[in-house]
Amino acid sequence: MRYLNEYRDPAVARGLVRQILDTATRRWVLMEVCGGQTHTIVKQGLDEILAPAVEMIHGPGCPVCVTSLEQIDKALALAARPDVLFTSFGDMLRVPGSECDLQQIRARGGDVRVVYSPLDALELAIKHPDKQVVFFAVGFETTAPANAMAVFRARELGVGNFSVLVSHVTVPPAMIAILDAPDNRVQGFLAAGHVCSVMGWTEYEPIAARYKVPIVVTGFEPVDILEGIALAVRQLEEGRYEVENQYVRAVRRAGVPPDGDRKST
C-alpha cells in the first residue's frame, strides 16, 4: 500500500497544486498522452482545479480510438469466416467498422470470444485444433511484449492454428502528428509512464528538441500527474525543452533491454 498511499496523499496534492499555480505566469496548454492518466485527471478534477493557469488536452492514448478502420474491417472479415475462432479484448467488440462491429458478427453466428490475455487465445487454439484461432492484437508499445510472447510460445509448442492480427501503434508518431497539425495548441506533454517503462524515453528526446516542447514521463496516480504537470510548467516558464522523468520508480532512460535486465538501464 506504500506506493498507493504515498501518491494519493491529499496534502501532497494540494501542495503541488499551489506550486503549479504559483509558478505559472501565463496560461499553458499540456497534453497527457495516456488514457489512464486522463481517467485520473477527470476523476479527481485536476483539470478543473488547475484552470485557467493550465489547460489539459486529452491525448490519443486509447487503443480503441487509434485502431484504423481498415484494421477493424480486416478483423470483421476474419471473424465472419466459419473456420475462424476470433478472439479480442472486450473493449473492441463494439468498435464499428464500415458496416458492423464484432458484437454484430457474433450475433450472426460468428465465433467471437473475449479474452483477457493473448495466452488465453493460445489456450483456445490448443483446445480447438479444428479452428484457426486469431487474436486481435491492438494497443501501444505496452501490449506488444505479451503478444510476442504468445506467438513465441505457440511456436515452441508447435501450435499451427494460432495467428495474430497485428494492429500495434507507437506513441511518438502520434505526438509528431499532433505537433505538425496547423491548429496545434499543445505546448508540452505528459508521456505515458507504462510505455516508457518498456521503451525508455530516448525516442522522445529528438521530439522535445525539434519542436521545443517539454516532455515529462509521468505515472498515473494524482500526485504523479501533478508532479508531471509541475515539471512541465517549470520548464515552460524557464524556456527549457527537455525530457524529464517523474516516474522514477518504474522508468529508466533505456527502458527494458532485450535480456530483461533492468539493472543495466
Regions found by a protein language model. Give the residues of each.
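Phosphate/pyrophosphate-binding betaalpha-module
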Residues: 136, 140-203
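A conserved active-site cap/scaffold subdomain adjacent to cofactor or substrate pockets
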Residues: 165, 183-252
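Conserved small/polar residues in nucleotide/adenosyl-binding loops
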Residues: 264-265
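Metallocofactor- and cofactor-centric catalytic cores in central/energy metabolism, strongly enriched
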Residues: 1-130, 144, 148-157, 165, ...
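Short catalytic-loop micro-motif centered on adjacent basic/acidic residues
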Residues: 30-32, 113, 134-137, 163-165, ...
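Short, surface-exposed amphipathic charged segments that create phosphate/polyanion-binding patches used
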Residues: 71-74, 126-133, 177-182, 204-206, ...
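Secondary-structure boundary elements
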Residues: 127-131, 153-160, 181-184, 213, ...
